[in-house]
């Protein structure tokens, strides 16, 4: 659930890692945005780029827009804005998808992503009907071959 996608194709990957700065928790956020890749340069067939989507941009303006949007969402998180999670769920490309999750203990969970809890936990129902609420793991959408 940490990718930005256009029509099912990955445009941007986002990584977040919790760290401790003394007694203050913090999160380090990194993002990789495919801006000018051509079809031949794509790392995987289910990726895309702003260039391939016909989206023109000026690099500095793009950076300002991304950082402004990130600041807005972080402010919503910090203030417990009740619209944040419904907004997120409305655009989630993961909810409703069959997924494979590699958990921190290297076990695999297969199931359907049913939702995201208000605290950000991904809700995955496995094949036995058990609902798992996950705080960490590597989530992959299962695609038909």
Question: Which ranges hold each PLM region?
Answer:
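Long, positively charged amphipathic alpha-helical accessory segments at protein N-termini or as interdomain linkers
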Residues: 6-145
């Amino acid at each position: 659930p940490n990718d930005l996608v256009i029509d099912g194709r990955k445009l941007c990957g986002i990584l977040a890692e919790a760290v401790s700065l003394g007694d203050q928790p913090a999160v380090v956020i990194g993002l990789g945005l495919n801006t000018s890749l051509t079809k031949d340069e794509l790392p995987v067939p289910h990726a895309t780029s702003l260039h391939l989507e016909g989206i023109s941009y000026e690099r500095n303006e793009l950076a300002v827009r991304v950082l402004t949007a990130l600041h807005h969402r972080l402010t919503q998180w910090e203030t417990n804005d009740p619209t944040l999670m419904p907004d997120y769920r409305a655009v989630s490309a993961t909810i409703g998808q069959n997924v494979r999750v590699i958990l921190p203990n290297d076990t695999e969970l297969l199931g359907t992503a049913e939702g995201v809890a208000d605290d950000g936990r991904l809700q995955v129902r496995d094949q036995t009907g058990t609902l798992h609420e996950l705080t960490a793991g590597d989530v992959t959408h299962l695609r038909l071959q």
